[in-house]
From Swiss-Prot:
One MF annotation (Gene Ontology) recorded for this entry: quinone binding
A GO BP entry: aerobic respiration
Domain 4Fe-4S ferredoxin-type: 50-82, 92-121
Xref: SUPFAM superfamilies: 4Fe-4S ferredoxins
A Pfam family it matches: Fer4_7
EC number: 7.1.1.-
Catalytic activity entry: a quinone + NADH + 5 H(+)(in) = a quinol + NAD(+) + 4 H(+)(out)
Record's subunit section: NDH-1 is composed of 14 different subunits. Subunits NuoA, H, J, K, L, M, N constitute the membrane sector of the complex.
Protein's name in the database: NADH-quinone oxidoreductase subunit I
Amino acid sequence: MFTTIKKTVIGLFTIVRSMWMVNSHALRPRDTILYPEVPVPVPPRFRGRIILSRDPDGDERCVACNLCAVACPVGCISLQKAEREDGRWYPEFFRINFSRCIFCGLCEEACPTTAIQMTPDFEMGEYVRQDLVYEKEHLLISGPGKYPDYNYYRVTGMAVADKPKGAAQNEAAPIDLRSLLP
Protein backbone atom coordinates (compact mmCIF):
# COMPACT_ATOMS: atom_id res chain seq x y z
CA MET A 1 0.00 0.00 0.00
CA PHE A 2 2.80 2.36 0.94
CA THR A 3 4.63 1.64 -2.33
CA THR A 4 1.46 2.30 -4.31
CA ILE A 5 1.04 5.72 -2.64
CA LYS A 6 4.74 6.42 -3.17
CA LYS A 7 4.51 5.54 -6.89
CA THR A 8 1.37 7.68 -7.25
CA VAL A 9 3.03 10.71 -5.62
CA ILE A 10 6.16 10.31 -7.73
CA GLY A 11 4.02 9.92 -10.87
CA LEU A 12 2.01 13.07 -10.04
CA PHE A 13 5.23 14.97 -9.32
CA THR A 14 6.73 14.02 -12.68
CA ILE A 15 3.50 15.01 -14.47
CA VAL A 16 3.41 18.40 -12.70
CA ARG A 17 7.12 18.94 -13.41
CA SER A 18 6.65 18.07 -17.10
CA MET A 19 3.64 20.40 -17.39
CA TRP A 20 5.66 23.18 -15.71
CA MET A 21 8.53 22.77 -18.18
CA VAL A 22 6.21 22.69 -21.20
CA ASN A 23 4.32 25.80 -20.08
CA SER A 24 7.51 27.71 -19.24
CA HIS A 25 8.90 27.02 -22.73
CA ALA A 26 5.58 27.83 -24.38
CA LEU A 27 5.71 31.41 -23.06
CA ARG A 28 9.29 32.13 -24.18
CA PRO A 29 9.98 34.05 -27.40
CA ARG A 30 10.46 31.83 -30.44
CA ASP A 31 13.87 31.05 -31.89
CA THR A 32 12.40 30.30 -35.30
CA ILE A 33 12.54 33.11 -37.87
CA LEU A 34 9.57 33.35 -40.20
CA TYR A 35 11.66 33.58 -43.37
CA PRO A 36 9.64 35.31 -46.06
CA GLU A 37 8.19 37.91 -43.69
CA VAL A 38 11.38 38.53 -41.68
CA PRO A 39 14.55 38.99 -43.76
CA VAL A 40 17.42 36.69 -42.87
CA PRO A 41 20.51 38.56 -41.61
CA VAL A 42 23.51 37.69 -43.77
CA PRO A 43 27.11 37.92 -42.52
CA PRO A 44 29.32 40.69 -43.92
CA ARG A 45 31.47 38.33 -46.04
CA PHE A 46 28.55 36.32 -47.39
CA ARG A 47 28.99 35.07 -50.97
CA GLY A 48 25.76 35.07 -52.93
CA ARG A 49 24.75 35.82 -56.52
CA ILE A 50 27.46 36.87 -58.98
CA ILE A 51 27.24 40.18 -60.86
CA LEU A 52 29.35 41.91 -63.51
CA SER A 53 30.19 45.53 -62.69
CA ARG A 54 31.17 48.52 -64.81
CA ASP A 55 34.02 51.04 -64.79
CA PRO A 56 33.44 54.51 -63.36
CA ASP A 57 33.37 55.58 -67.04
CA GLY A 58 30.40 53.27 -67.69
CA ASP A 59 32.22 50.63 -69.77
CA GLU A 60 32.21 46.94 -68.91
CA ARG A 61 35.04 45.98 -66.58
CA CYS A 62 35.34 42.46 -67.91
CA VAL A 63 38.20 42.07 -70.39
CA ALA A 64 37.42 38.41 -71.18
CA CYS A 65 40.73 37.17 -69.80
CA ASN A 66 39.08 33.81 -68.96
CA LEU A 67 40.72 33.61 -65.52
CA CYS A 68 37.34 33.24 -63.81
CA ALA A 69 36.42 30.24 -65.97
CA VAL A 70 39.79 28.61 -65.26
CA ALA A 71 39.52 29.24 -61.50
CA CYS A 72 35.97 27.86 -61.27
CA PRO A 73 36.20 24.35 -59.75
CA VAL A 74 32.90 23.18 -61.29
CA GLY A 75 33.26 24.89 -64.68
CA CYS A 76 30.00 26.81 -64.60
CA ILE A 77 31.40 29.96 -66.28
CA SER A 78 31.82 30.24 -70.04
CA LEU A 79 32.70 33.28 -72.12
CA GLN A 80 34.00 34.30 -75.54
CA LYS A 81 36.46 37.14 -76.10
CA ALA A 82 35.91 39.86 -78.70
CA GLU A 83 37.81 43.07 -79.49
CA ARG A 84 36.46 46.56 -80.05
CA GLU A 85 37.77 49.03 -82.61
CA ASP A 86 39.94 50.78 -80.01
CA GLY A 87 41.67 47.51 -79.08
CA ARG A 88 39.86 46.91 -75.82
CA TRP A 89 38.69 43.35 -75.14
CA TYR A 90 35.20 42.53 -73.95
CA PRO A 91 33.17 39.33 -73.56
CA GLU A 92 31.02 38.66 -76.60
CA PHE A 93 28.95 36.39 -74.36
CA PHE A 94 29.31 35.66 -70.65
CA ARG A 95 27.30 32.79 -69.21
CA ILE A 96 27.05 31.42 -65.65
CA ASN A 97 25.11 28.27 -64.83
CA PHE A 98 23.94 28.88 -61.25
CA SER A 99 22.54 25.36 -60.98
CA ARG A 100 26.16 24.15 -60.94
CA CYS A 101 27.75 27.08 -59.07
CA ILE A 102 28.90 26.34 -55.51
CA PHE A 103 29.37 30.05 -54.65
CA CYS A 104 32.97 29.56 -53.56
CA GLY A 105 34.11 33.02 -54.67
CA LEU A 106 37.21 31.83 -56.54
CA CYS A 107 36.05 33.61 -59.70
CA GLU A 108 35.88 36.90 -57.79
CA GLU A 109 39.39 36.41 -56.42
CA ALA A 110 40.80 35.51 -59.84
CA CYS A 111 39.32 38.52 -61.65
CA PRO A 112 42.06 41.17 -62.17
CA THR A 113 39.57 43.88 -63.14
CA THR A 114 37.14 43.33 -60.22
CA ALA A 115 34.41 42.84 -62.81
CA ILE A 116 33.01 39.77 -61.04
CA GLN A 117 31.61 40.54 -57.62
CA MET A 118 29.56 38.51 -55.16
CA THR A 119 26.40 40.07 -53.73
CA PRO A 120 24.43 39.10 -50.61
CA ASP A 121 21.47 38.07 -52.78
CA PHE A 122 20.69 34.39 -52.23
CA GLU A 123 17.06 34.06 -53.28
CA MET A 124 17.51 32.37 -56.64
CA GLY A 125 14.97 29.56 -56.50
CA GLU A 126 13.52 28.54 -59.89
CA TYR A 127 11.24 25.75 -61.04
CA VAL A 128 12.98 25.30 -64.40
CA ARG A 129 16.70 24.56 -64.36
CA GLN A 130 17.28 26.49 -67.60
CA ASP A 131 16.19 29.68 -65.80
CA LEU A 132 19.32 29.41 -63.64
CA VAL A 133 21.59 29.99 -66.65
CA TYR A 134 22.32 33.73 -66.59
CA GLU A 135 23.63 35.60 -69.62
CA LYS A 136 25.69 38.80 -69.64
CA GLU A 137 22.56 40.96 -69.87
CA HIS A 138 21.24 39.47 -66.61
CA LEU A 139 24.55 39.80 -64.76
CA LEU A 140 25.66 43.29 -65.83
CA ILE A 141 24.75 46.08 -63.41
CA SER A 142 24.80 49.80 -64.09
CA GLY A 143 27.29 50.79 -61.37
CA PRO A 144 30.84 49.99 -60.26
CA GLY A 145 29.79 47.76 -57.34
CA LYS A 146 32.14 47.37 -54.37
CA TYR A 147 35.07 49.24 -55.92
CA PRO A 148 33.76 52.58 -57.25
CA ASP A 149 37.14 54.21 -58.05
CA TYR A 150 38.96 51.27 -59.66
CA ASN A 151 39.57 51.42 -63.41
CA TYR A 152 41.62 48.53 -64.77
CA TYR A 153 42.88 50.30 -67.87
CA ARG A 154 44.02 53.31 -65.85
CA VAL A 155 45.89 51.10 -63.37
CA THR A 156 47.59 48.85 -65.93
CA GLY A 157 48.84 51.75 -68.02
CA MET A 158 47.48 50.40 -71.30
CA ALA A 159 46.88 52.82 -74.11
CA VAL A 160 43.22 53.80 -74.38
CA ALA A 161 41.53 55.06 -77.55
CA ASP A 162 44.72 55.42 -79.62
CA LYS A 163 46.41 57.66 -77.04
CA PRO A 164 50.00 57.03 -76.01
CA LYS A 165 50.79 56.06 -72.44
CA GLY A 166 50.53 59.06 -70.15
CA ALA A 167 48.21 61.04 -72.44
CA ALA A 168 44.89 59.67 -71.17
CA GLN A 169 42.76 61.45 -68.60
CA ASN A 170 44.09 61.25 -65.00
CA GLU A 171 47.15 59.30 -66.11
CA ALA A 172 50.74 60.12 -65.20
CA ALA A 173 53.46 60.18 -67.82
CA PRO A 174 55.61 57.03 -68.06
CA ILE A 175 58.69 56.99 -65.85
CA ASP A 176 62.10 56.69 -67.50
CA LEU A 177 63.92 54.14 -65.34
CA ARG A 178 67.35 55.32 -66.51
CA SER A 179 66.74 58.72 -64.98
CA LEU A 180 66.39 57.07 -61.58
CA LEU A 181 69.88 55.53 -61.70
CA PRO A 182 72.65 57.20 -59.66
